[in-house]
Amino acid sequence: MRFGIKNVVKNIADGLFPPRCRGCGELGAYLCKCCKKNISENMKARELEGAGGVFDEAVYLGYRDEILGELIEEAKYESVRGELLEIAEVVWRGYLQGLGEAVLVPMPTSRKHVRERAMDHMDRICREVERLSGGKVKRVRLLTRAKDTVQVGASPEVRKKQAKEAVKVDEKVVAEFLRERPEARVVLMDDVWTTGASMVEAGKLLCKAGVSKLTAVAITKSRTRKSPAIRHGEID
């Protein structure tokens, strides 16, 4: 109920007071055209460490303390749907459109958070990318939640344990998908890479189910040491 009332108030406020760009402060959008263009054109995919050899390629596109990370935090915890559309456009133009035909698989959000926020933020981002691509990129929900664990604030050890129980493959959807597109490139997407435990375990499940081409894309990660920049397999 708390989140529902908050969403209504937020929608009314947005109607009365248009949002300001999170990059430059310009009135009228959560991210203005100029800032979207700047972020997209300067986006660099950097290699994710700790992917455990599960993926053909594992990259992140920005840091949590940058504009993309701020947009994600607001979208998730304040239920600002408009920001998800801006994130999707930047990620599509800055990286995903360079992959060619691909299948996006969103990491499923816990059912508790979906109820609270009245949305699954990663599924919404992937659906918008599918729309922007004109059908070149497809979104398929190969994964579902198995257990409603919440990892925010958990230690790395707890996260690893939770990750093994958090998601499962949708066997019916996967079987149909593999019959129709056995050689498709699957792109597993999540908003934040912290320890990477959830994405790695999800990747293992997809590989075990028969997915042969698997890429991991985290939109942001916590800032640690600098990682080498790559774009579609090339050292930048």
For each feature predicted by the language model, list its residue ranges.
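Glycine-rich phosphate/pyrophosphate-handling loop used in enzymes and phosphotransfer proteins
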Residues: M1-D236
